Amino acid sequence: MLEDRRLEVLRAIVEDFVLSNEPVGSKALAERHNLGVSPATVRNDMSALEEEGYITQPHTSAGRIPTDKGYRLFVDRLSGVKPLSRAERRAIQSFLEGAVDLDDVVRRSVRLLAQLTRQVAVVQYPSLSSSSIRHIEVVTLGPYRLLMVLITDTGRVEQRIVDSLVPVDDEVAGELRSVLNCALAGRRLVDAPDIVAALPDSTRSELRPYLTTVAGAVLESLVERQEERIAMAGTANLTRSPVDFADSLRSILEALEEQVVLMKLIGSARETGTVTVRIGRETDVDALRSTAVVATGYGRGPFALGGMGVLGPMRMDYPGTMAAVRAVAKYVGELLGAD
């Protein structure tokens, strides 16, 4: 285990390198930070840190920069995540509360994360496996046409126009609405297909033709939404400091075009309130070895409805980024949990 003083030296190196993007020397560290020791002692500590793989010397005459291992230790030893100011929290809450529906919540969240962190932001729509049906509405559009609207507990809305082979009126629409909500309201989306498929056989014969048609529309809505959806913003932020990515910028952009990669990065966030940080090779994606990912889950209670996070260079402001991701996730969870 590293001595406390060497941990302080490593912390100072990370903080200075994040700010300057320049290798850090022992003299500069001693001058800028209250380490309580001479530059010579700092130099010895830096040599020890280098031997243990926490920092490296990019050029013969240059200072040191953190390695993946150094960033990892820095993050693991953070005493606390830097809290956002009251004004910042109020601004986040106000911006998100202006959303009119789920799509708007996701769009605002991903834009806000990208702006706050100046990184690439990714937000997963609420996972179907975690969502349930809040209400199903059925209304007549004409003598042979119905509108079916399915609303989830997270605000997802699916609409289907249903054509009927037999005339339909408001009384029939009301009865269909009652049957569907009695069977499905409060049930998880993943359980709904089996329930819907069995409905026509348990309904009075006069209503069966209508219910068969509407049930088919409900099933179509559920099947078509099995693929998880994500939103992304801020890819232009990667070009702010191309030196951080050397020759890997193109491969990073190509990797971000793959939804399976994005889901791998943020979809594994299963708990709310817990921020995870994956650095370099920890992303398990070859093209992203020069990046870091900060992610968390959002939702009501301990289990996440979905994940969100940011991707940027390993040389990032980890305390500030973690605070921003946690704050946005908290407010999104509260917003989606409101009745």
From Swiss-Prot:
Family (UniProt): Belongs to the HrcA family.
GO-annotated biological processes: negative regulation of DNA-templated transcription
UniProt KW keywords: Repressor, Stress response, Transcription, Transcription regulation
Protein known as: Heat-inducible transcription repressor HrcA
Gene: hrcA
Signal peptide residue numbers: none
Role description: Negative regulator of class I heat shock genes (grpE-dnaK-dnaJ and groELS operons). Prevents heat-shock induction of these operons.
One Pfam family linked to the record: HrcA
GO molecular function, one term: DNA binding
Alphabetized InterPro entries for the sequence: DeoR_HTH, GAF-like_dom_sf, HrcA, HrcA_C, WH-like_DNA-bd_sf, WH_DNA-bd_sf, WHTH_transcript_rep_HrcA_IDD
